[in-house]
Design a protein with these regions (language model features):
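Glycine-rich FAD pyrophosphate-binding loop
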Residues: 7, 20-42
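Conserved N-terminal helical subregion
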Residues: 53, 60-61, 70, 75-124
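Basic, alpha-helical nucleic-acid-binding regions used in initiation and control of genome expression
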Residues: 64
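Beta1/beta-strand and adjacent pyrophosphate-binding region of the FAD-binding site
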Residues: 1-14, 30
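Conserved N-terminal glycine-rich FAD pyrophosphate-binding loop of Rossmann-like flavoproteins
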Residues: 35-58
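Fold-independent oxyanion-binding glycine-rich loops
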Residues: 11-12, 34-35, 79, 117
Length: 124
């Protein structure tokens, strides 16, 4: 039986971010997920600057090896009419691939990862 101070069930962005903070606080943390990472995740592939700040992401480091596409604006308009470009000049969001993003956050957490293992029993 594995022992730890904190068991985080789920290795997605919320679980891995929680694990990272707990590891930084000096706790022995394990993350358990029924999936193996990297995994395909059908989900929107965008993060905002607020997410970048909340997760303390180093965009230069992340973008060096993983998909990171800054979006500074968008086009909008009714069907069949001319589209209007709205450009904010600075990134309002970043395109990412969830399989890369989730794996990066989980690896970066510093927690012990038990992937491919569903939670079947829990004892205190």
């Amino acid at each position: 039986m594995d022992r730890c101070d904190v068991l985080v069930v789920g290795g997605g962005p919320a679980g891995s971010s929680c694990a990272r903070r707990l590891v930084r606080a000096g706790l022995d943390v394990a993350v358990l997920d029924k999936a193996r990472f990297p995994r395909d995740k059908v989900c929107a592939g965008w993060i905002t600057p607020a997410v970048v700040r909340a997760l303390d992401l180093d965009l230069a480091e992340y973008g060096r090896h993983l998909t990171l596409q800054p979006f500074t604006g968008f086009r909008t308009g009714p069907f069949g009419k001319e589209l209007r470009l709205i450009d904010f000049g600075t990134p309002i969001s970043y395109g990412i691939r969830r399989c890369e993003f989730d794996h990066y956050l989980l690896t970066r957490s510093g927690a012990r990862v038990m992937a491919g293992q569903p939670l079947t029993d829990l004892r205190r």
